UniProtKB/Swiss-Prot annotation:
This protein's record includes keyword Nuclease: yes
Keyword annotations: Cytoplasm, Hydrolase, Nuclease, Ribosome biogenesis
Family label: Belongs to the YqgF nuclease family.
Top-rank taxon, per record: Bacteria
InterPro entries, alphabetized: RNaseH-like_sf, YqgF, YqgF/RNaseH-like_dom, YqgF/RNaseH-like_dom_sf
UniProt-recorded name of the protein: Putative pre-16S rRNA nuclease
Main subcellular location: cytoplasm
EC number: 3.1.-.-
Gene Ontology CC: cytosol
Length: 151
């Protein structure tokens, strides 16, 4: 268990091609899909993220940390950590990494129940996965905080 920080959060489901983004507030117990950042260079992706940061004024970030179902590191684990450190470096906000093992499965299931398919599904899948990551964080799942210092 971890103490849930107060205030607005932005959560990220990081991928090399697409980054799903969700927004929420633990005090209200609400989170919602927000955007999918796609294509372009890292600078272009971070410019799009900067616009979301400007608009939503988060107090912290939550980044999904991919691991295999048995808990071992995934090939994307290192890249997600690097992404989180870059968020911290660019915006000087704490980053909480959370296990995202089942976020995509949850997102797929939710979208199937809502009968969202095809191009629409692809456009929102990463956002809904980010929402699942944020919801898990709000529910008190295990998290690791990074605030600009390796330790």
């Amino acid at each position: 268990m971890h103490k849930i920080p107060k205030g607005t959060a932005l959560a990220f489901d990081f991928g090399e091609a697409r980054i799903g983004v969700a927004q929420g507030d633990a005090e209200l117990g609400l989170s919602h899909p927000l955007a999918t950042v796609t294509g372009g260079s890292n600078d272009e992706k971070f410019a799009a993220i900067a616009k979301l940061v400007q608009e939503w004024q988060p107090r912290y970030f939550v980044v999904g940390l991919p691991v295999h179902t048995d808990g071992t590191k995934h090939e994307m684990t290192h890249l997600s950590r690097k992404f989180g450190r870059r968020l911290n470096g660019r915006f000087n906000l704490p980053v909480y990494w959370v296990d995202e093992r089942l976020s995509s499965v949850y997102a797929e299931s939710l979208l199937s129940e809502a009968q969202v398919f095809g191009k629409k599904r692809k456009s929102v899948l990463d956002q809904v996965a980010a929402q699942a990551i944020l919801h898990g964080f709000f529910e008190g799942g295990p998290a690791e905080c990074f605030n600009g210092r390796e330790g």
